[in-house]
Amino acid sequence: MRILLNTLYVTTPEAYLSKDGLNVVISVKGDEVFRIPIHNIEQIVTFGYMGASPGLMKLCADSGVALTFLSPHGRYVGRLQGPTRGNVLLRKAQYKYAEDVDYSLHLSKLFIAAKIQNYRNILRRFVRDNGENSDVVLAAEELQKCKNRTFKATSVDSIRGIEGDAASTYFGVFAQLMLNQRDTFVFTGRNRRPPKDAVNAMLSFVYTLICNDMAAALETVGLDPYVGFMHTLRPGRASLALDMMEELRAYLGDRLVLSLINRKQITIKDFLQQGDEGVVMTDTGKKIILSAWQNRKKEQIVHPYLNEKVSIGLLPYIQSMLLARYIRRDIDDYPVFLIK
């Protein structure tokens, strides 16, 4: 159980939520493990299928505390919200700002500058841990130039172009970050739909996991994941989730893929070539990645803005909450997530 930004996160899948007077009570296998007065929180987010008592649901509704249910893996299930206009007003503000060119440009700059900086930090960490590599050093320097260009951009379209240049530079040296199995995990650049090699298959799969978590997080805080500021509206596309995941791709996705390859936790035998479908993962390969993904989300870091220890799996929810606060004008700017 963690309380962040006035939100109670119940991350134990076996937890059952009930009430005792005006207190929220968390129990695991019949034993009480946590309680908190309802008036101390604004929202409860629970990961699991054990559920909550009708009494607690009524208490939350009467107290204006949103109760959000997610699967143990973070997929959005549903949300109980009492008679409040908070989410309506938040989404109304979101839709208004999504049509505001200057507002969208500002957020787009933040999303992509953070993405590029996190690219740089991965390259710099590689050099720090493994010694000088001229190609990687030059790529990091080029990424700094791309980041500088981002802040000078005058349109979202130009930011997309800079993003493309940065991705080309970063993935141009990505293969050099693979210390093992480089002869079998051949990578010559980013490709998708379908992925043409095992590395791209893994990247696409992990990015999908991040996008799903981000969409669930946005739903949880009351934002519409389908209306973004940089990615254009398209039926069925979670544009805001795609916007928000940009700053997390390198930290959550790329590092996981590199770790699995370098530690030989996954091998080329976990992939198949399937004609027009390109390279796909076997069921065993998917299980390996999903297991590593869930373990990774349990690890703890100090959040750079909150300066608190949090599990990595909560990052999409924290960033979504911070964006909601920025849209509500509770904070002066949106604090992006940057790794060291």
Give the predicted meaning of each segment.
Residues 1-19, 29, 35, 87-226, ...:
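Active-site helix-to-loop segments that bind/position phosphate- or nucleotide-bearing substrates
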Residues 24-25:
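Hydrophobic residues embedded in beta-strands of well-ordered beta-sheets
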Residues 28-30, 48:
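Short, well-ordered turn and helix-capping elements at secondary-structure junctions
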Residues 38-52:
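Extracellular/luminal Protease-associated
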Residues 42, 54, 58, 208:
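Short alpha-helical basic/polar micro-motif
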Residues 45-49, 70, 206:
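Short His-Asn-centered micro-motif
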Residues 52-54, 58-63, 67-109, 120:
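Phosphate- and other anionic-substrate recognition elements at nucleic-acid/protein interfaces
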